[in-house]
Amino acid sequence: DMDLIVSMEGFNGNVRTYIEDTFEPNEIFHNGNAYSFDYKELQIDFITVSPEDYGSNYHYLAFNDLGNFIGRIAQSMGLKYGQEGLWYNHFHNDQKVGKIMISKDYPKIFDFLGLNYARWIEGFDSLEDIFEYIIQSPNFDSEMYEMKNLNKINRERNLKRKSYMSFLDYIAENAPNITGPDHNKPKILKEASIFFECNVFTEIKRFEYHDAERAYASAKFNGGMVMDKYGLKGQALGVAMKNFKGLVISHMGITESYHQY
């Protein structure tokens, strides 16, 4: 198959129609920002992205499963690495309340994760070259890739990926007992904020403020109160809540934040 990263800059048409007119496929499967179709017995995956995410998608998707392997290193450090770059998911009161972008500067990202960006630029001739590249990171840990240490979604996804399973075999044969550093994740986050010159902790406070604001608003007015007082349930309850919110915003001049009301 072939993956094509397509920048949507300057394109205002319908992607499905463009594919139908240009490639005349038998079938098109659409999932999120990806369109999969057949062309001359080859499966094509059109991955449509905004111009600002073109480079980050290229870096993540290049060289087979390498981006996935790098993502596990970032995860061990309390960060996320994917098709949008490097970021941090902040949890407050056991719930995710915000996503904080850290960087799209790949030489710096690779440096921070303990990877050689110049070597990445050279490219890789084989899966074994990719495997060895990951193992050489000082943040590599043999256990972090084991199925038992993945969540259900990643476990099910990676079981279907031949390159991931080959990597597990390679680790078992060549690097079975490498233990990576025991990262102090709050310390790593502080180091990242300095290294990338980003306002991580300001954003954390902003997300926590808005989370507290939502909790306060919910304590004042929520679906349970409406259900108890008026006996509404299901769809009727949802409509009533939506209409009340619309009334507050449109007729009472509360435009900045419904939760402030």
Predicted regions and their residues:
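Extended, charge-rich intrinsically disordered regulatory tails
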Residues: A217-Y261
